[in-house]
Amino acid sequence: MGKPTGFMEYDRCEARSVEPKERIKNFDEFHIFLSKEKQREQAARCMDCGVPFCQSGMTVAGMTSGCPLHNLVPEWNDLLYTGNYQQAYNRLHKTNNFPEFTSRVCPALCEKACTCGHWGDPVSVRDNEHGIIETAYKEGYAGPVSYTHLRAHETDQYL
């Protein structure tokens, strides 16, 4: 856990989005991710609770609670807090092959399951995910992945 008292010290901060009437004028990014300092504060809010429901992805009575991809949310929040973006990206990429998409379109079920959200506002997990992947592309440690080394065992065909 990055900062044991972070959830008490910092308020939730969400990334802003460009207004729809402005969005339609161009094809630019309209989710403006948080600054590194704000991401660090939001990561500090992660309590690293004993049972991280945010990453559980459980289906109860036909409804999903937590991340269905089982993203290692407390782990990459801790890495964000310490400023280790490359390791945070590696942790994120372990369970999520397309964080560049999910950070934009995911309904953030992890935030609904966040323990911190039971007594206040949940951690801005989706915004942190967005920040991790954008930083990874900007700093050059994320990019196209080649899967040509994988082999389909039954057909002996290469992917």
Where do the protein language model's features map onto the residues?
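N-terminal pre-domain segments of enzymes
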Residues: M1-A15
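Glycine/serine-rich phosphate-binding loop and adjoining beta1-alpha1 elements at the start
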Residues: R40, A44, D48-S56, G62-S146
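Alpha-helical structural elements
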Residues: G2-T5, E22, H153
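Cationic, low-complexity basic patches in intrinsically disordered or flexible, solvent-exposed regions
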Residues: Y158
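Electrostatic cytochrome c docking/interface patches
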Residues: H31, S35-K36
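Short, contiguous pre-domain boundary segments
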Residues: R12-F30
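Conserved small/polar residues in nucleotide/adenosyl-binding loops
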Residues: T148-T155
